[in-house]
Amino acid sequence: MFEKLAVLKVKLGDRHSDIVLRDIQLWRKPLDGDNDNGLDRSISNVKEINYLKGEFLQYIDINKIPLWLRSSEHFSNLLICFTTSTTTNAFFESKLKYINRGIVIEVNSAAAAAAANNYQHRYLIFYKNGHNVEFIPIDLSLKELFDNKIASLNADTENVTEGKEKKKSSSIDKILMQSQKKVFVQTNKVMESLQISEKRQKFNETLSKLILSGLRLRGIPNTQSGFQKIYKMTFDTTEFAHREELVKLSHNTIHEIPFEDIQETVETLLKLFTKS
């Protein structure tokens, strides 16, 4: 046997202030038939109808609602919604056509407290089950218990740590500091390696351009036999001649090898290798 629990009127918020959902009838039927033994007696003894006001909050995926947030009433009863309002019916048909979508309604706490038998649920979630619109009452008592436990644990933690020297870091702080220091060191190493690589690349590019320019001035085209041999000999010998500077460059102890020094070495070697 169905039992009428309440009639709800809902505002849709500022964006749709001109629309009010009326005559949202909340009904209950025990899942085991007409036997009310499993019901919360404070609810099953309702003799008067609760007239409540509520406001739309948001949409939600009903599959993501924790079981411990659902009122025990939800598990032992069929909780279903009826209406004679075409506006209300059209709203539910339109907004609940998506799979697993739920509509969260906040019941006005003052209105609930003033209603017959002090209707206890502040939040209701409406969803579509087949052709029916059903609802889930949300029970926040367990959440409040969790919140109180957390607050108590935080207070205990503060009492335990109070009086300790401020300069001492917690183990988590130490871990974070060590991690940050490690990241900082690694970043510096990477940046230093990049700088060294860029300096060496600049040296190679400068050396290559000087050799090619010197060979071109001497009228030796890259198609001529022996061009590659002279180029490689000059390149390798210049590197050897500046080996000490290159070592310092790799250790980042000097900024760069002066262009004039490289040019002078290349010119000397090209005169030697080309006899010009």
Curated annotation (Swiss-Prot):
InterPro entries in UniProt: Sld7_C (IPR041260), Sld7_N (IPR041564)
Coiled-coil blocks: none
Record's keyword annotation contains Electron transport: no
Pfam families in the cross-refs: Sld7_C (PF18596), Sld7_N (PF18636)
Any Gene Ontology CC annotation: chromosome, centromeric region
Function, in words: Required for the proper initiation of DNA replication. Required for mitochondrial morphology.
Keyword Glycosyltransferase: no
Protein name: Mitochondrial morphogenesis protein SLD7
Protein's GO biological process: DNA replication; regulation of DNA-templated DNA replication initiation
Family membership noted in the UniProt record: Belongs to the SLD7 family.
Keywords annotated in UniProt: Cell cycle, Cytoplasm, Cytoskeleton, DNA replication, Nucleus
Localization of this protein: Nucleus; Cytoplasm, Cytoskeleton, Spindle pole
Gene coding for it: SLD7
Organism from which the protein derives: Vanderwaltozyma polyspora (strain ATCC 22028 / DSM 70294 / BCRC 21397 / CBS 2163 / NBRC 10782 / NRRL Y-8283 / UCD 57-17) (Kluyveromyces polysporus)
